[in-house]
């Protein structure tokens, strides 16, 4: 293992034309989402028949269960809008215990030429946190950029993956964005569950290949930030055993949720502190032995709040539960994260869901903001160190954006996403190099 320190001399800028596409599309999508914040999309929010799985779910992971044409937000730097047709997709994946389950997502086929080297690839995107309610599913907000509902109560969810989807579509790649298990479809969304999120990403790649009429030899890359960064990191390390046939070339795991315990401690009392409820609810769904232990330490208000959060979207926790401190949910005023750390019943769950225990077989770029106030820098760096110690090929880049309004998430968590994902020296370059067959060098820690 060769671990280096300092900037990687092999990093290069994207070609000017590709940089222009990436920057223009990212800005246009962000502006479009801002414009539609005044619009309501009741139809998009209603799960409807499409999101209801059949009585018998095909057992084979990656099986396409059904598709449905869908429109896409057209506010892009082109009169033609998006360069490919899009579909809602439902496909088979596996729960933590191996049981088949239906998961939905968005598939965007490519129409224009592939602007990178080699054959046209598939890009599977692990989305960032959208919430835990069915209406929070990312696929329900691709038409408008945002979903606003008023029944039974006001709710808001934005599609954070419009920029990434649009950029890769403009470059000529096929794109699949998974909704994850339990978002849109029945059951609890198992937020930050390493195993189930990895399954959804890997089986999404299998389903995308089927829709494209291509085989597993199709070049594949993973892209994700925050919750999505953790999801694709987990997918990268599980791919050799779970989906060895896939031709994975590389992964960008930006600001990855790798150590759930560290995340719970960091966001407690922050603007999106309510996301702790997503994590607790997901744990209880897969580790029922935890329920009695959590009930013992939570007050009635705490239990009611956790139940309400199970149907909330990311916008809701900002408007209804801003800067939530979980000490307000417990009998003794101690944070829920501290209680979890002390519970013998929680130890297996927190260990199971930690990313970094396996070894990815293909190169991974990890980026993290030193001053990220939502997903701690140290646990992202630890993931890189863990993988490097196992002989993986990893590049770790530190984003030095200074602290701006600490605890409010947007500057110091989403700022590095835009810089590292779409800036002049970015994750797109890294993945294009992998698709072009350029070798990555050992372990580089920046």
Range-by-range predicted roles:
Residues 257-357:
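Accessory cap/linker subdomain of secreted extracellular hydrolases
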């Amino acid at each position: 293992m060769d671990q280096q320190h300092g900037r990687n001399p092999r990093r290069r800028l994207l070609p000017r034309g590709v940089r222009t596409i990436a920057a223009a599309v990212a800005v246009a999508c962000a502006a479009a989402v801002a414009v539609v914040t005044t619009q309501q999309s009741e139809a998009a929010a209603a799960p409807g028949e499409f999101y209801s799985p059949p009585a018998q779910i095909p057992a084979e992971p990656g099986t396409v269960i059904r598709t449905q044409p869908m429109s896409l937000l057209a506010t892009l730097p082109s009169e033609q809008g998006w360069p490919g047709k899009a579909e809602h997709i439902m496909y088979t994946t596996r729960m933590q215990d191996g049981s088949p389950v239906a998961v939905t997502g968005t598939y965007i086929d490519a129409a224009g030429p592939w602007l990178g080297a080699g054959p046209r690839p598939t890009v599977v995107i692990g989305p960032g946190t959208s919430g835990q309610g069915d209406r929070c599913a990312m696929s329900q907000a691709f038409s408008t950029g945002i979903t606003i509902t008023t029944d039974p109560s006001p709710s808001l969810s934005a599609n954070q993956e419009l920029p990434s989807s649009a950029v890769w579509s403009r470059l000529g790649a096929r794109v699949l964005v998974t909704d994850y298990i339990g978002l849109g479809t029945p059951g609890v969304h198992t937020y930050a569950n390493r195993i189930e999120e990895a399954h959804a990403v890997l089986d999404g790649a299998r389903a995308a290949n089927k829709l494209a009429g291509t085989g597993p030899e199709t070049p594949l890359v993973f892209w994700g930030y925050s919750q999505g960064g953790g999801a694709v990191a987990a997918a990268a390390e599980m791919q050799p055993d779970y989906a060895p046939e896939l031709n994975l070339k590389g992964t960008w795991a930006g600001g990855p949720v790798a150590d759930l315990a560290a995340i719970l401690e960091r966001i407690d009392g922050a603007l999106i502190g309510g996301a702790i409820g997503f994590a607790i609810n997901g744990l209880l769904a897969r580790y029922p032995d935890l329920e009695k232990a959590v009930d013992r330490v939570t007050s009635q208000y705490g239990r009611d709040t956790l139940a309400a959060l199970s149907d909330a979207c990311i916008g809701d926790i900002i408007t209804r539960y801003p800067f939530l401190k979980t000490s307000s949910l417990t009998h003794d005023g101690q944070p829920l994260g501290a209680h979890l750390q002390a519970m013998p019943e929680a130890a297996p769950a927190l260990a199971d869901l930690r990313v970094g225990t396996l070894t990815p077989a293909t190169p991974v770029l990890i980026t993290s903001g030193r001053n990220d106030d939502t997903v701690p820098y140290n646990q992202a760096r630890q993931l890189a160190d863990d993988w490097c110690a196992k002989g993986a090929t990893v590049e770790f880049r530190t984003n030095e954006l200074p602290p701006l309004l600490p605890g409010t998430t947007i500057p110091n968590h989403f700022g590095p996403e835009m810089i590292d994902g779409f800036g002049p020296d970015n994750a797109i370059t890294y993945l294009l190099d992998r698709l072009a067959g350029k070798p990555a060098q050992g372990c580089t820690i920046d």
